[in-house]
Amino acid sequence: MNERADRSGGAAPGGDRTHRVPVLVVGGSLVGLSTSVFLGRLGVRHTLVERHAGTSIHPRGRGNNVRTMEIFRVAGTEPDIRRAAATLADNHGILQAPTLAGDAGEWLFKQIDPGGGLARFSPSSWCLCSQNDLEPELLTHATNLGGDLRFGTELLSFEADTEGVTAIVKSRETGEHTTIRADYLVAADGPRSPVREQLGIGQSGPGDLFHNVSITFRSRRLADVVGDRRFIVCYLTDENADGALLPVDNRENWVFHAPWHPEQGETVEDFTDERCAAHIRRAIGDPDLDVEITGKAPWHAAQRVARSYRSGRVLLAGDSAHEMSPTGAFGSNTGIQDAHNLAWKLAAVLEGWAGEALLDTYDTERRPVAEATSARAAHRSVEHSHPGFAPPPVAGGGGPGAGTPGGAGRGTGGPGGPGGPGGLGGPGGPGGTGGPGGPGGPGGPDGPRGAGGAPGGGPGGGPGGGGPQRGILNVALGYRYPRGAVVGADPATPVVPEGLDLTGAPGSRAPHLWVRRGQDRLSTLDLYEDSLVLLSDAAQPTGWHEAAAGVAAGMRVPLKSYRVGGSPGADLNPDDEETDWARAHGVTRGGAVLVRPDGFVAWRSPGPAPDPESMLRQVVGTVLARS
């Protein structure tokens, strides 16, 4: 089936010529389009090429986790994305049943954020927006920001040297060739990634995990069978017709994921419309159900991570850098967050306020996140049932995914719903990865704060649950960078901590506090996008604010300084008078916190410094790789 909406009008006109641009983005799916939006917000000229004629038209990859939505909030896209997702705004739970007809089923959980506890940590929340609805919104924003987006344009070849990359692209509509000379190339070209393969970058991980076929269909009577059960995904467990059912509009459009076993000689061609319709009827439990098949897309779940995210002037992002089990909807979210990490670093280097070595920290920071996240996703896949997934027994236990055959198959995508809210007894279903496949849902939040102060309770169980159950909020929001463009981080700190700890530690996502700037109410996270930011106390004459002005001018670095507190002269006033901004960031009122443009803490000083400008200059130089 044609899975892209035609937007080939963006292809370059004219004959052979050389086009010069700071950044060339290869791939125009979620990660490529997000990269374009983030670069556009930072004023970085770029060209994006995508071989397909337009954006995805297949409903898949629906799970956008809270960190992704925070990023989209700062980028100005969140309101439009939520409008595009309005149809499924009231769908929250994961249901499991032998069949839907005549069986109430068992709710694995009914709410993504029971009790609304997520608001303590974030101004945003999860959003179910399928890829076919999300990509057009990103495309519109990227275009409005001045992005040069060329759909229907294929990368034919590229050569990288020490000064940049020379690429040859071809309009698939006209056959015309264009030479593009870029300072950097971002490869968001999917799990098969010709760019990665040409560079000879290998991959680690067990490989393919399982295969499904995503079937889109229409059924007017199915809504009556479903009734008021507003699930994100329903796992149907009849041993002769298992599968995962997902609503597209809660009325007549649906997606069903059926197991596919190519290792047994089964082909995609075996999935005829008649076979698919019969399977769906058996799974639903209604032999007379009206089923009109409208599309089919094979996909696989895999666990692979590139051994390097950078080769000179070329950087990998999204599925070209990592594939992971669909459990928890980590794949596309991790890719979008790759793009966010990379965009500010490219801007800093291209604009001359950071050293070129800053780009090395992209691999240093993001690859361990993908490794830890993919391992956690595989762990949850062992815990949760999914059609076609049967992890082999591993002698001696092993780790998540150990013993899984590492095939060379390529495909993409993943279905599913959110991982369940930990600590509440509800395991979650799988969420989507980033390529063609089924829609994914968000991971559920951790359980209530335990006695020790960390969400999800004590160290005996994972966050958000005991024993093998692990919460997802610490994975989606609490991951950190023990090494990279940070100063003072503990290199022994796990990338994914056992609990959610957003208290201002270097390498972690900065805390969220509601503040007032004049008449405007905003989250502190809204401050972080196009510059470094220094927070200090408005009532303490420690010299941090003046030091920031001196460093910004002397080093020619975009560095904004905000004095926080209820005192006269404060730039930011906490919305709640009881809020202690310094304590929330792990410092005293005499200290300071430096936050990066991506909202991660670069460094903090617990208290005053004898020479704050000298200290800050040294820290900024280290963070930005300034020799």
Curated annotation (Swiss-Prot):
Biased composition (Gly residues): 395-469
InterPro entries from the UniProt entry: FAD-bd, FAD/NAD-bd_sf, RIFMO-like
UniProt keyword annotation of Cell wall biogenesis/degradation present: no
Superkingdom of origin: Bacteria
Signal peptide: none
Residues at which FAD binds: 22-51, 309-319
Required co-factors: FAD
Coiled-coil residue spans: none
Protein keywords: FAD, Flavoprotein, Oxidoreductase
Molecular function as annotated in GO: FAD binding; oxidoreductase activity; oxidoreductase activity, acting on paired donors, with incorporation or reduction of molecular oxygen, NAD(P)H as one donor, and incorporation of one atom of oxygen
EC numbers, comma separated: 1.14.13.-
Start and end residues of each stretch annotated as Disordered: 370-469
Keyword Zinc-finger belongs to the record: no
PANTHER family, sorted: BINDING MONOOXYGENASE, PUTATIVE (JCVI)-RELATED, TRK SYSTEM POTASSIUM UPTAKE PROTEIN
Family note: Belongs to the PheA/TfdB FAD monooxygenase family.
Purpose of the protein: Involved in developmentally regulated synthesis of a compound biosynthetically related to polyketide antibiotics which is essential for spore color in Streptococcus coelicolor.
Protein name as it appears in the record: Putative polyketide hydroxylase
